[in-house]
């Protein structure tokens, strides 16, 4: 219950205002979390409306099971499975797709989930602890090269190679020290390597982000769900995406810009602009949390919401 109360949905009203254009439409919440956005969407829908939500986290599924509403359905799966799940339900087109990326406060604040370096816990980091390889399992087998690439590319950490070497060196001591399987020890290893300090940021922040993204295939799944959302949106349907770090936002921005731009054509070819296919999306801008929201919920500070509408059939 405590974690439920601590979670504050970011850009709640702004996201739902941007998403819901038809009260009788079919909508998708790709990241149910603790249900803030889903409940707000349901409040905007008529009796004919429908909301299908996705989440990998069993605790999110447990929370969603408490919503007794015939218009609502929860799917225990990654949003990357959206297209197949909707096809199986006979849903070919939707009026809107909402994606609220990253981890939720209850996940971060629960030491047992292994997402945070602030309290010691098992080194897990899986959105769904019942599926896939944990962070500890991956760290126990990854090479220096693989560790370096993940920490550098997903954490934008300039000390990635040194951190990777330190992790592998610690692994060599497993017979004497036991496995590297706690968030506290990983944070300590990183802290010994990263001597510089970014204002307001723990030295382990980038490494933990990188490992979490890798373990959960977050960026690959994001690319898949963006393509799925584009194929599912009806004309006039909205795609609303809330990102919390530059890697996510870069992918979202590039995808939206690509599909909102006319195809490039060699000017020397005898082709008129009117003969070219219209881009499927129209960009409706981006939004940031207000100063008041950030003051009430500091974790909202890095959020950016991008909105696009399908304009082509």
Curated annotation (Swiss-Prot):
Gene Ontology CC terms: cytoplasm
Enzyme class (EC, first level): transferase
Annotated binding of S-adenosyl-L-methionine, by residue: 35-37, 55, 79, 100, 107
Molecular functions per Gene Ontology: rRNA (cytosine-N4-)-methyltransferase activity
Location relative to the cell: Cytoplasm
InterPro entries to which the protein is assigned, alphabetical: RsmH, SAM-dep_MeTrfase_MraW_recog, SAM-dependent_MTases_sf
E.C. designation(s): 2.1.1.199
Top-level taxon in the UniProt lineage: Bacteria
Swiss-Prot/TrEMBL keywords: Cytoplasm, Methyltransferase, rRNA processing, S-adenosyl-L-methionine, Transferase
Pfam families per record: Methyltransf_5
Reactions the enzyme catalyzes: cytidine(1402) in 16S rRNA + S-adenosyl-L-methionine = N(4)-methylcytidine(1402) in 16S rRNA + S-adenosyl-L-homocysteine + H(+)
A biological-process GO annotation: rRNA base methylation
Disulfide pattern: none
Primary localization: cytoplasm
Role according to the record: Specifically methylates the N4 position of cytidine in position 1402 (C1402) of 16S rRNA.
HAMAP family per record: 16SrRNA_methyltr_H
Family of the protein in this entry: Belongs to the methyltransferase superfamily. RsmH family.
Protein name, per record: Ribosomal RNA small subunit methyltransferase H
């Amino acid at each position: 219950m405590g974690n439920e109360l601590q979670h504050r949905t970011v850009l709640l009203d702004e996201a739902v205002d941007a998403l819901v254009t038809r009260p009788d439409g079919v909508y998708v919440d790709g990241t149910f979390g603790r249900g803030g956005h889903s409940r707000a969407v349901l409040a905007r829908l008529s009796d004919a409306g429908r909301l299908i939500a996705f989440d990998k986290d069993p605790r999110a599924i447990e929370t969603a099971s408490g919503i007794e509403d015939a218009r609502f359905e929860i799917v225990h799966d990654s949003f990357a499975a959206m297209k197949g799940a909707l096809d199986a339900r006979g849903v070919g087109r939707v009026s809107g797709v909402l994606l609220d990326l990253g981890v939720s406060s209850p996940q971060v604040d629960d030491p047992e989930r292994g997402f945070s370096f602030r309290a010691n816990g098992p080194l897990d980091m899986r959105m769904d602890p019942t599926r896939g390889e944990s962070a500890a399992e991956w760290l126990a087998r990854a090479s220096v090269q693989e560790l370096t690439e993940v920490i550098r590319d997903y954490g934008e950490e300039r000390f990635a190679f040194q951190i990777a070497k330190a992790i592998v060196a610690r692994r060599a001591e497993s017979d004497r020290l036991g496995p590297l399987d706690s968030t506290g020890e990983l944070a300590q290893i990183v802290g010994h390597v990263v001597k510089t300090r970014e204002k307001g940021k723990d030295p382990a922040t980038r490494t933990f982000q990188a490992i979490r993204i890798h373990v959960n295939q977050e960026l690959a799944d994001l690319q898949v769900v963006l393509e799925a959302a584009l194929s599912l949106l009806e004309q006039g349907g909205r795609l609303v995406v809330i990102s919390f770090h530059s890697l996510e936002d870069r992918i979202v921005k590039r995808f939206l810009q690509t599909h909102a731009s006319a195809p490039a054509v060699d000017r020397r070819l005898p082709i008129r602009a009117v003969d070219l296919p219209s881009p499927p999306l129209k960009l409706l801008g981006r939004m940031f949390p207000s100063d008041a929201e950030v003051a009430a919920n500091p974790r909202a500070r890095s959020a950016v919401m991008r909105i696009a509408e399908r304009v082509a059939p």
